[in-house]
């Protein structure tokens, strides 16, 4: 009886401790970010097992002893650092914060793009609009704003976007070109990276990029620099959500990469309907995206789930990281049949290949 009670008490205390971590999470985030950006983690790592005292860290980084103390003690509380004989040493957590590209990309994205705007998450949820985007200016969505955002914010946004998508492109190309498409429509082409990889991979394909004019201007520059202007063309569209704005047609393949998650379910349905009209009779629709319910590792699902508030507060106010089953239903309701599903591309992407059918049913309804 006593043993059982003690065990329960420990569980309650642990739960309360975890709750405090959430309560203080913004403080910890900013302090640990400064440990990284002020090179405190770097000099501690370089010291190796002996570690460094506060005074030595201050001398090597130019940060005051007061500042070093404040930041290192927060790092200690979060298992970023450990202390022995007044010397701080890096833990495994600290190592990943300093050296892991995934962690760096995520931290920069959250700080530069999302942090201030997330203060207005409640407004965004109430209105269905990206209220947090107002910290940068007056736009309806972040996609319209991208070419106008401060350079550091742009850099963190594109690095985040490309870090995830770029890793999957080489894995996806064989699936696309095994079917030998001669023409491909890249919807949401962004900076043109996938289009460039397509024409490099296959000498016969012609790619049409469709996106907002501001995005295509950047893509056009990148393509011209690579010398592929004769095989990649642009199709600017001012409002992807205008259901009357038709897509160009007759394509052997239509490609959407990290695209549908940028929209609400109703908007996705409209986009899929128009994508169907863009396909040649035997054409294929390819959807490359990340679904948190198809991830092999818990860390991937965690990152994806907690990216959804970005879409709410900053991107458009009504989209999120979807479960696969939700997208599957929208695909079939739009008149497509799923031909194949391949998981594990790049950093946890799933590639869905679809063809049109007149008798589609939602298997997951």
Question: What label would you give each PLM region?
Answer:
Residues 6, 10, 16-46, 59-60, ...:
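Conserved Class I S-adenosyl-L-methionine-dependent methyltransferase catalytic core
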């Amino acid at each position: 009886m006593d043993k059982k009670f003690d065990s329960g008490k420990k569980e309650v205390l642990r739960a309360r401790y975890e709750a405090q971590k959430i309560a203080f999470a913004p403080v910890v985030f900013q302090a640990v970010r400064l440990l990284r950006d002020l090179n405190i983690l770097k000099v501690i790592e370089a010291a190796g097992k002996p570690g460094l005292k506060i005074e030595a860290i201050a001398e090597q980084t130019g940060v005051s002893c007061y500042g070093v103390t404040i930041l290192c003690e927060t790092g200690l509380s979060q298992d970023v650092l450990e202390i022995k004989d007044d010397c701080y040493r890096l833990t495994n957590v600290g190592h990943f914060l300093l050296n892991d590209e995934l962690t760096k990309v995520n931290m920069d994205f959250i700080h530069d793009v999302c942090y201030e705007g997330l203060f207005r998450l409640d407004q965004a949820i109430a209105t269905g609009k990206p209220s947090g985007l107002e910290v940068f200016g007056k736009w309806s969505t972040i996609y319209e704003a991208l070419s106008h955002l401060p350079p550091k914010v742009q850099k963190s946004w594109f690095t985040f976007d490309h870090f995830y998508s770029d890793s999957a492109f080489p894995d996806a190309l064989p699936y696309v070109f095994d079917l030998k498409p001669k023409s491909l429509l890249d919807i949401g082409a962004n900076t043109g990276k996938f289009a460039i990889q397509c024409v490099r991979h296959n000498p016969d394909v012609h790619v049409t990029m469709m996106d907002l004019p501001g995005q295509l201007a950047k893509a056009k520059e990148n393509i011209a620099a690579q010398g592929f202007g004769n095989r990649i063309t642009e199709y600017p569209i001012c409002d992807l959500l205008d259901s009357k704005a038709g897509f160009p047609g007759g394509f052997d393949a239509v490609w959407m990469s990290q695209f549908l998650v940028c929209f609400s379910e109703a908007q996705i349905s409209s986009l899929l309907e128009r994508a169907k009209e863009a396909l040649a009779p035997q054409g294929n629709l390819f959807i490359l995206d990340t679904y948190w319910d198809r991830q092999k590792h818990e860390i991937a699902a965690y990152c994806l789930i907690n990216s959804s508030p970005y879409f709410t507060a900053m991107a458009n106010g009504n989209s999120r990281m979807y479960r696969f089953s939700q997208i599957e239903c929208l695909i079939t309701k739009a008149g497509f049949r799923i031909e194949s599903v391949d998981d594990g591309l790049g950093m946890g992407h799933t590639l869905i290949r679809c063809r049109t059918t007149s008798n589609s049913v939602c298997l997951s309804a």
